[in-house]
Amino acid sequence: SSAASDVYKRLRDITVQVGRTGKLTPVAELDPVVVAGSTVARATLHNEDEVQRKDVRVGDTVIVRKAGDVIPEVLGPVLALRPADAVQWEMPRTCPSCGSPVIREEGEVDFRCISIDCPAQALERLLHWASRGAMDIDGMGEEIVSRLVESGRLSDVADYYTLDEVELSLLDMGRVNKDGEPIRLGSTVAKKLVAAIDESRTRPFARALFGLGIRHVGKTIAE
């Protein structure tokens, strides 16, 4: 059913996510709760204006609504339950990923990190390129992309097309097995990934344009 369900949860923290165009989005970190059949531990707060308009503060008990498949939303605080030391939230003035100053342009609601060397933006851009609406590189998810970025092997979308099966199979996944040996990606997954990368070369140009993730260029404009 698409009926909305409301629950009351404690707002443990407000963290900041950095998107592929440098946009900073505040995220409500909640005590996990089951709403409308799924477990919710985070909800978007959109931007600083929205946080201040709703006046939600870390430590507050907040009303969380989930309707259908929509991302859960924080409606507002229960003021009667507010801790005495709760302070109004402000967007950090430096990027949580790279430490560069963030700016908010005239007439814009969003703060942005404008550093071209920001790791969080690079990761999001690389994931966007591989995503279903763009080049659709099947199996190229966040964990693998993160490891490739950390190993210095992937920093630009062109780098995808220089990856080979052997080096992918040896990619250290940052975990160890029960014998304490590093877990590697392995040849089965590597073979599938190389095939998916090759297949992505045949996508129409509009998909590549969308995959580049230029600000204000959505799928329709790209086409």
Put a short name on every predicted segment.
Residues S1-Y8:
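Short, small-residue-biased leader/transition segments that mark boundaries at the very start
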Residues L11-R20, L24-W89:
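Conserved nucleotide-binding/hydrolysis modules and their immediate coupling elements
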Residues V62-E223:
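Structural signature for extended repeat/solenoid scaffolds and their inter-repeat hinge/linker regions
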